[in-house]
């Protein structure tokens, strides 16, 4: 392993539309924003596990299913995807976060 291999992403990034299709086929969508952000609006079926508590709550995440992570813009979810990947999860980051989800015209829950 080279010096810079530790910086390589161990997860894929998918569009909001692809994430929705994966969710409909059994993937688990985790919203890593803070609770007040989630309460304003979130993707249907998304489970709230804020980035700050993600590592403490790994046992709540099914290891046998594909995991999708979303935040506001894609930054926190990218960090979350790295944490989950490091812990053996099959994970994908939702590109552009919930903002891109909404721009794509996908449903949100208020």
Predicted regions and their residues:
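Rhodanese-like catalytic fold shared by cysteine-dependent sulfurtransferases
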Residues: 1-27, 35-66, 75-110
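Short, surface-exposed ligand- or partner-binding patches at beta-edge/loop junctions that are enriched
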Residues: 70
């Amino acid at each position: 392993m080279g010096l810079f291999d530790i910086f390589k992403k161990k997860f894929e990034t998918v569009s909001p539309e692809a994430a929705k299709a994966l969710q409909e086929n059994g993937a688990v969508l985790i919203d890593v924003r803070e609770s007040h952000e989630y309460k304003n609006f979130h993707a249907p079926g998304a489970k709230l596990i804020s980035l700050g508590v993600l590592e403490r709550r790994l046992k709540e995440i099914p290891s046998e299913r594909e995991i999708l992570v979303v935040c506001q813009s894609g930054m926190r979810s990218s960090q979350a995807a790295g944490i989950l990947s490091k812990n053996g999860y099959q994970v994908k980051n939702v590109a552009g976060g919930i903002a891109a989800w909404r721009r794509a015209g996908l449903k949100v829950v208020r």
